[in-house]
């Protein structure tokens, strides 16, 4: 579907004059991020860029048109140009782009930069006519691209207007060369050479200066003047006299009177016909005009100098100069308006022969030939859907009237899938209901296959809307209706059946359904659905207590992502999310944190509401490390997101766990009570997220001293967990039950429950749940271990837990949290200097991190502040504590810790 001419730089520059004053300015271009040619139309931006780069080996060229405002099209063309510039060093990124397997342009560009690390040669990529881009997402992504691209790459932009690419910042930092219309406008010397090259009689300096002043050095106007002199066999003096009133606003009139009317009618008609096309080759022109001499005509007109640019490549691609193309379009609409629809229709048919349905449907829409639009959609609609042309498809479908749209059930279904694929779930049911009603009005009999596809789609919407029973009913109905060959909908329906059984706690049914879904999806190469099935299987296995098996299955998910270039799709974040949850439960916090941050990067360009899970995990990790200030920032994000959006209980339960653990660490019982007052209480607890929500409720009651309510919640939890064989949740519930018993001073019961939990942990490995309440259960674990009440495996686990609890407590001290500082400043033996020159909370944190061996940069990253801010904190604490250097700071911190008994 890609047009070769958009990726080829203009050729045949032998008629262009050499411009040393501009070329001299460009000699230092390799040391700059951006070279910007900015001027109004017709100043030779493209020609100048092409001339400058003509002898450079590593150049990629991208000629932009207004259809490139679609991010998918833009990035595909850009990466093809980059590959040409870097000897195809970005091939993996190109595959990702072609398959639309990226969550945002930023994340895709990160892959590009990683691949470009191996290419060290000077290279250039040209974005020609960038002013046609009006998509803010593309602008923002290109700002990111310019900021982070490797030093050996220079981006060259031609544009009529100042592009919103952060040029002010680049200019201030001296990272941009800007060639404006002042530089591109011909000076007198260049004007003289220009006309001497084209006019037999030549030109003297005075006349050249007059001409240059007359048109303000505008190259296109000078070209028009030269053309007039050539074709009318007039001297330059006569030509100048005839255009004495020429100005930019009169360009169309000038072109008509002095150029266009001089052509024979056949040539004029040919040009107006061809101007329907933005880019063209002889095959397209032949299909459009039925002229067998199409290539000869084009080359003849190119020699004639009528602003037709030949483009590099073997397929004889050409395009009009933008200005001349606009003029021809103006003339076409004025002179042959009755042919407009036929021309666009013929152009659509011509592009179909070039196997470019995207271009074809664009012209079909302009021709308002709805029958042709329907024909293209019926033949290529699903192919375009799979290739990500969603905006184009929706625009075309919206142009159809009701009769046409609903006379073709295939298009009705495509319209509904477009809504689903763009996350407009609430519209899908309405669209399908409307289609059903309209089909009945037209006596269109809907076969069971269509109804099966509709039910599969509605089943997916129902499960997304937390209506599992309805989703199951629809999915099973869809499977009974669908033909075996309709694999996409059968896979979706099978997946929904598995997911519903998972949600209802029927894990033994859910797992085989998801295994079947994965098998079908792999067989038919529907890899997104295969990944989804792997994720569901992993969650089911975790719930069943087979956590190591789930972990290994996740590895197969990561392999699938790598093999099929799925790194940038949102499902990758889902996999990282459940991997982080397992790692947190195994107390592998650094790895869990890495997964959470990777997830945020993948979702960078999605709605902030999708970041809730990542922030929940990051908060939990910070709490586990005792970094409560850092956790507080994540908690603020969580609370803001939960106020702004409505979430599934799976999301809110995870977020609420982090909130409760944070408030527990802060001793904020008021916040816990406020949460409990409004907490959702699911009717059942037959799946992992309902179990988590009820466990949050039990934990809240414990923190508030409401032990009877906590007991009631835990009894309900364990009853449901045993009923549905939720092994891992049973394990987690036992830990909370032990905490409740300890709070109620029932030590024997607490130890019994802990022992049972430790036995189960041999299978699940769930140690993180013990560590969240280390202060409560640490002593109990020690007593269990000393009394030899545990088996060897359980004793080893208990000893490791005690070690981790001790390490976490020390970590909290090293990070100098509020409790530690309060005890320190009130200690009778604390140095007087600490009392009289109290450090701020942040300065204490910085001192603790210095003691832990963190560099200034690492401290800034840890506290999420600027490096200059850290330097200020260090300077202040050095001054307050009379410290000269980092070595003395470490000694001071160590002395304070020893004073406190660490």
From Swiss-Prot:
Pfam families: GerE (PF00196), TPR_MalT (PF17874). SMART domains: HTH_LUXR. Disulfide bonds: none annotated. SUPFAM superfamilies: C-terminal effector domain of the bipartite response regulators (SSF46894), P-loop containing nucleoside triphosphate hydrolases (SSF52540), TPR-like (SSF48452). It comes from the Bacteria. Keywords: Activator, ATP-binding, Carbohydrate metabolism, DNA-binding, Nucleotide-binding, Transcription, Transcription regulation. One of its GO terms (biological process) is positive regulation of DNA-templated transcription. ATP binds at residues 39-46. Activated by ATP and maltotriose, which are both required for DNA binding. InterPro entries: P-loop_NTPase, Sig_transdc_resp-reg_C-effctor, TPR-like_helical_dom_sf, TPR_MalT, Tscrpt_reg_HTH_MalT, Tscrpt_reg_LuxR_C, WH-like_DNA-bd_sf. Gene3D superfamilies: P-loop containing nucleotide triphosphate hydrolases, Tetratricopeptide repeat domain, Winged helix-like DNA-binding domain superfamily/Winged helix DNA-binding domain. GO terms for molecular function: ATP binding; DNA binding; DNA-binding transcription factor activity. PROSITE patterns: HTH_LUXR_1, HTH_LUXR_2. Residues 856-875 bind DNA. Residues 832-897 form the HTH luxR-type domain. Positively regulates the transcription of the maltose regulon whose gene products are responsible for uptake and catabolism of malto-oligosaccharides. Specifically binds to the promoter region of its target genes, recognizing a short DNA motif called the MalT box. Belongs to the MalT family. Monomer in solution. Oligomerizes to an active state in the presence of the positive effectors ATP and maltotriose. This is HTH-type transcriptional regulator MalT. The gene is malT.
């Amino acid at each position: 579907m890609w047009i070769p001419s958009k990726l080829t730089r203009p050729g045949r520059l032998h008629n262009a004059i050499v411009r040393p004053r501009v070329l001299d300015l460009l000699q230092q271009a390799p040391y700059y991020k951006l070279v910007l040619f900015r001027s109004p139309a017709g100043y030779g931006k493209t020609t100048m860029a092409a001339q400058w780069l003509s002898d450079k080996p590593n150049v990629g060229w991208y000629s932009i048109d207004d259809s490139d405002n679609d991010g998918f099209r833009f990035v595909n063309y850009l990466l093809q140009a980059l590959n040409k510039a870097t000897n195809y060093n970005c091939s993996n990124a190109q595959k990702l782009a072609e398959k639309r397997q990226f969550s945002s342009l930023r994340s895709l560009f990160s892959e590009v930069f990683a691949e470009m690390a191996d290419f060290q040669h000077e290279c250039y990529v040209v974005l020609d006519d960038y002013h046609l881009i009006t998509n803010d997402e593309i602008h923002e992504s290109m700002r990111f691209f310019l900021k982070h691209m490797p030093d050996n790459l220079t981006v060259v932009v031609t544009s009529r207007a100042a592009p919103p690419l952060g040029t002010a910042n680049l200019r201030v930092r001296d990272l941009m060369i800007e060639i404006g219309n002042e530089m591109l406008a011909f000076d007198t010397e260049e004007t003289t050479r220009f006309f001497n090259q084209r006019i037999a009689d030549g030109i003297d300096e005075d006349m050249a200066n007059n001409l240059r002043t007359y048109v303000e050095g505008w190259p296109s106007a000078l070209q028009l003047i030269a053309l007039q002199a050539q074709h009318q066999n007039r001297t330059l003096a006569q030509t100048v006299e005839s255009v004495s009133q020429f100005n930019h606003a009169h360009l169309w009139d000038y072109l008509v009177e002095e150029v266009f009317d001089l052509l024979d009618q056949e040539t004029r008609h040919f040009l107006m016909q061809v101007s329907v096309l933005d880019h063209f080759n002889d095959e397209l022109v032949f299909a459009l005009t039925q002229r067998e001499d199409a290539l000869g005509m084009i080359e003849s007109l190119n020699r004639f100098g009528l602003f037709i640019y030949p483009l590099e490549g073997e397929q004889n691609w050409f395009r009009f100069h933008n200005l001349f193309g606009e003029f021809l379009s103006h003339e076409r609409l004025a002179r042959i308006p009755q042919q407009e629809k036929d021309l666009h229709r013929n152009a659509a048919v011509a592009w179909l022969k070039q196997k470019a349905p995207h271009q074809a449907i664009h012209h079909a829409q302009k021709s308002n030939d709805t029958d042709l639009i329907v024909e293209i959609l019926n033949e290529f609609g699903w192919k375009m859907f799979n290739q990500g042309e969603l905006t184009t498809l929706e625009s075309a479908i919206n142009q159809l009237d009701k009769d046409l749209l609903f006379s073709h059930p295939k298009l009705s279904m495509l319209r509904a899938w477009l809504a689903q694929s763009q996350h407009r779930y609430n519209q899908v049911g309405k669209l399908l209901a409307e289609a059903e009603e309209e089909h009945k009005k037209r006596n269109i009999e809907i076969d069971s296959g269509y109804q099966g596809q509709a039910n599969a789609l509605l089943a997916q919407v129902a499960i997304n809307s937390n209506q599992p029973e309805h989703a199951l009913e629809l999915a099973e109905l869809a499977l009974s209706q669908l033909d075996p060959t309709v694999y996409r909908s059968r896979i979706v329906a099978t997946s929904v059946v598995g997911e519903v059984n998972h949600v209802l706690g029927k894990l033994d049914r859910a797992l085989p359904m998801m295994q079947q879904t994965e098998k079908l999806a792999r067989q038919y190469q529907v890899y997104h659905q295969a990944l989804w099935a792997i994720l569901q299987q992993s969650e089911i296995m975790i719930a069943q207590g087979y956590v190591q098996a789930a972990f290994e299955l996740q590895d197969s998910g990561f392999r699938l992502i790598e093999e099929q270039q799925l790194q940038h799709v949102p499902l990758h974040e889902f996999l990282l999310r459940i991997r982080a949850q397992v790692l947190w439960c195994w107390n592998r916090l650094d790895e869990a944190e890495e997964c959470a941050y990777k997830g945020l990067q993948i979702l960078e360009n999605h709605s902030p509401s999708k970041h809730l899970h990542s922030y929940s995990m990051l908060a939990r990790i910070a709490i586990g490390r005792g970094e409560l200030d850092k956790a507080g920032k994540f908690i603020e994000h969580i609370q803001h997101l939960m106020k702004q959006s409505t979430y599934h209980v799976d999301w809110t339960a995870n977020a609420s766990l982090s909130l409760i653990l944070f408030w527990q660490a802060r001793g904020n019982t008021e916040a816990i009570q406020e949460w409990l007052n409004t907490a959702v209480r699911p009717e059942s607890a037959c799946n992992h997220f309902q179990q988590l929500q009820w466990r949050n409720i039990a934990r809240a009651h414990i923190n508030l001293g409401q032990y009877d309510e906590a007991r009631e919640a835990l009894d309900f939890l364990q009853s449901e967990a045993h009923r549905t064989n939720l092994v891992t949740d049973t394990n987690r519930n036992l830990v909370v039950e032990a905490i409740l018993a300890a709070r109620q001073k029932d030590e024997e019961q607490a130890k019994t429950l802990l022992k049972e939990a430790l036995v189960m942990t041999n299978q699940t490995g769930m140690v993180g749940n013990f560590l969240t309440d280390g202060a409560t259960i640490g002593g109990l674990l020690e007593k269990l271990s000393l009394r030899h009440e545990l088996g060897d495996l359980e004793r080893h686990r208990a000893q490791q837990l005690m070690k981790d609890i001790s390490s976490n407590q020390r970590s909290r001290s090293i990070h100098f949290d509020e409790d530690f500082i309060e005890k320190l400043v009130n200690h009778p033996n604390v140095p007087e200097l600490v009392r009289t020159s109290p450090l701020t909370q942040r300065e204490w944190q910085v001192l603790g991190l210095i003691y832990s061996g963190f560099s200034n940069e690492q401290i800034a990253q840890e506290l999420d502040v600027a490096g200059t801010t850290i330097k200020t904190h260090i300077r202040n604490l050095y001054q307050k504590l009379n410290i000269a250097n980092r070595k003395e700071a470490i000694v001071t911190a160590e002395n304070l810790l020893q004073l406190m008994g660490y």
